[in-house]
Curated annotation (Swiss-Prot):
A motif (Q motif) lies at residues 84-112. GO terms for biological process: Group II intron splicing. Residues 115-288 form the Helicase ATP-binding domain. It comes from Oryza sativa subsp. japonica. Its EC number is 3.6.4.13. It is an enzyme of class 3 (hydrolase). This is DEAD-box ATP-dependent RNA helicase 53. Gene3D superfamilies: P-loop containing nucleotide triphosphate hydrolases. GO terms for cellular component: cytoplasm. Belongs to the DEAD box helicase family. DDX21/DDX50 subfamily. PROSITE patterns: HELICASE_ATP_BIND_1, HELICASE_CTER, Q_MOTIF. One of its GO terms (molecular function) is ATP hydrolysis activity. InterPro entries: DEAD/DEAH_box_helicase_dom, DEAD_box_RNA_helicase, Helicase_ATP-bd, Helicase_C-like, P-loop_NTPase, RNA_helicase_DEAD_Q_motif.
Length: 602
């Protein structure tokens, strides 16, 4: 039956006296018809999918929010707090509905302070403590204006708003906020992932672009990002963009933007470069300063503690601190280096569910790690300062500064991962005796006061976070098949003489000589880090190098846990020498008695 109909339609279409037959044929043979239809032949390739163009890039209209809506009395009407009801802002019902679905019905101080000038289209500079919800502060006005513009003119191909962020984590967080708060097409662009996917999304058309300056410059040079219709530009964490070297890229991007736009800049500090770009690219900006001359820049609900510890004893006091102050909730431990984060996460993983986060981890793995931490699949995140800014992880109960931050501002941003959005939290600073002066400087710079915690004795086995090995892998690795005591019973090798400190307590991460079996102390009274192995173990591959490979933090492949030429493995010591200092130093020592190899960047 189908073949007879097909032949009849083909004959009708070929007859010059049958225009109605051609019309019928055209209607039946739609683009969705089978490419094997005998009347059509092979299907033509589909053109690139693009959104409908709006008529012209006309400026977005603005309206003023009634001042009464942002008055203290309005917030006091419901709940008696300083909030502002989202439903009373007069913004798009789409935004109100989506924010309500996320549990956001009221705004915080910086949001209500920014709202009125943003709705009027004025340039502004926003300064506030970390964790106060800056993303919604500039996001609500932008989303509302673009939604109303698209309802009137249709969606265009080129973006109408661009937000610059210093890190990929912050960029992803901002773009996620837009995506969850309004039915707009948004795109996050950053390095470390294939650029082709981002180019395809731009060809399709987007409303909002969020990204790091470096990748945005790359897209501009390739000609796939058109900024000619931009009417909103936001610089988020502008001071951090200066710190990571994006200052020139930011100025190049600002030079390529239309003159008729609204510019908003948000920063915790105001260095000279910030003042330069505000005077050059912002028009009579309004300053929204919720910090002012106050020294305290930390969230209101944060409790600050400090605790003194010897360097080799730091790992052992983490367990008691987490148990007492995190109360089973989320905890972020900040380290100075990527290697240190890897080591600490690996060690803590024997007794706790934890993972590491730093710049050398692939983007896909970073996303999985952050997702798992947010969802509660593990509660301890060991991170470098890559996580100090921009990551909006809810319900972090405790922040531990395993090493002192380089600056007071970095301490603020690290600690600001807890006590966010009006909640309570704690931050603990671990310091050595020779760092006591640096702690006082932080107190003076920030205007805070630490509560000193009593010192925890490292030798207290009940307090050692590593004295219980819950992982079956440790018992398997401690069997003769995998090299004896290199992993076995007590952990990373036995420490023969004296009492092992740090990770090397007899019942902690180091086993006694009689129970360890295959490894001996390298000669120091205290175990250096995870243990020094005089007798080599070749369980995990061999290395032809005469330099000891230690753990290497690869995938336990060739070279890790290896036999080396001088029959001595320095475990986690990263210095260039095979000699050992007698000074205890946590994860390994160099000739100078200091931690070796911890000088990599974040």
């Amino acid at each position: 039956m189908f073949s007879l109909l097909s032949r009849a339609l083909c004959a009708a279409s070929s007859s010059p006296a049958a225009p109605r037959g051609r019309s019928l044929l055209a209607a039946l043979l739609s683009p969705s018809a089978s490419p094997l239809d005998p009347c059509r032949g092979p299907a033509a390739p589909e053109p690139p999918r693009r959104r409908a163009f709006h008529g012209s890039p006309s400026p977005l209209g603005f309206r003023s929010t009634p001042a009464s809506w942002s008055s203290p009395e309005a917030g006091a009407a419901v709940g008696g707090d300083d909030g502002l009801e989202v439903a009373r802002l007069g913004i798009s019902p789409w935004i109100v509905e989506r924010l309500a679905a996320r549990g956001i019905t009221r705004l915080f101080p910086i949001q209500r302070a920014v709202l009125d000038p943003a709705m009027q289209g004025k340039d502004m500079i926003g300064r506030a403590r970390t964790g106060t919800g800056k993303t919604l502060a500039f996001g609500i006005p932008i989303m509302d204006r673009i939604l109303r513009h698209n309802e009137k003119n249709g969606s265009g191909r080129n973006p109408l708003a661009i937000i610059l962020a210093p890190t990929r984590e912050l960029a992803r967080q901002v773009e996620k906020e837009f995506k969850e708060s309004a039915p707009l097409d948004s795109l996050c662009v950053y390095g470390g992932v294939p650029i082709s996917h981002q180019m395809r999304a731009l060809n399709y058309g987007v409303d909002v672009v969020v990204g790091t300056p470096g990748r945005i410059i790359d897209l501009l040079r390739r000609g796939v990002l058109n900024l000619s219709e931009i009417q909103f530009v936001v610089l988020d964490e502008a001071d951090q963009m200066l710190a990571v070297g994006f200052d020139e890229d930011v100025e190049v991007i600002m030079e390529n933007l239309p003159q008729n736009r609204q510019s908003m800049l948000f920063s915790a500090t105001m260095p000279s470069w910030i003042r330069k770009i505000t005077s050059k690219y912002l028009k009579d900006p309004i300053i929204i300063d919720l910090v002012g001359d106050e020294d305290q820049k930390l969230p209101e609900g944060i409790s600050l503690y400090s605790i003194a510890s010897e360097h080799y004893g730091k790992p052992s006091i983490l367990g008691p601190l987490i148990k007492e102050h995190a109360n089973g909730g989320k905890c972020i431990v900040f380290t100075q280096t990527k290697r240190e984060a890897d080591r600490l996460a690996y060690a803590m993983g024997r007794s706790y569910a934890c993972q590491a986060l730093h710049g050398d981890i692939s983007q896909n793995q970073r996303e999985r790690t952050l997702s798992g931490f947010r969802d509660g699949r593990f509660n301890i995140l060991v991170a470098t300062d890559v996580a100090a800014r921009g990551l909006d992880i809810p319900n972090v109960d405790l922040v531990i500064h395993y090493e002192l931050p380089n600056t007071s501002e970095l301490f603020v941003h690290r600690s600001g991962r807890t006590a966010r959005a009006g909640k309570k939290g704690s931050a603990i600073l671990i310091y050595t005796n020779d760092q006591a002066r640096a702690v006082r400087i932080i107190e003076q710079d920030i205007g805070c006061k630490f509560t000193e915690l009593p010192k925890i004795e490292v030798a207290d086995e009940a307090s050692d976070m590593f004295n219980v090995v819950r992982d079956n892998r440790s018992r398997l690795a401690g069997s003769p098949r995998t090299g004896g005591s290199s992993f076995g019973r007590g952990g990373y090798g036995g420490f023969g003489e004296g009492r092992s400190r740090g990770f090397g307590d007899f019942d902690g991460f180091g086993s006694s000589p009689n129970r360890g079996g295959r490894s001996r102390d390298a000669g120091s009274r205290y175990g250096s880090g995870f243990g020094d192995f005089r007798r080599p173990s070749n369980a995990f591959g061999r290395s032809s190098s005469k330099q000891p490979d230690g753990f290497g933090f690869g995938d336990f492949g060739e070279g890790n846990f290896s036999r080396n030429g001088n029959r001595r493995s320095r475990s986690f010591d990263d210095s260039g020498s095979t000699r050992y200092s007698r000074r205890p130093n946590g994860f390994g020592t160099s000739d100078f008695g200091r931690s070796g190899g911890f000088d990599d960047s974040n």
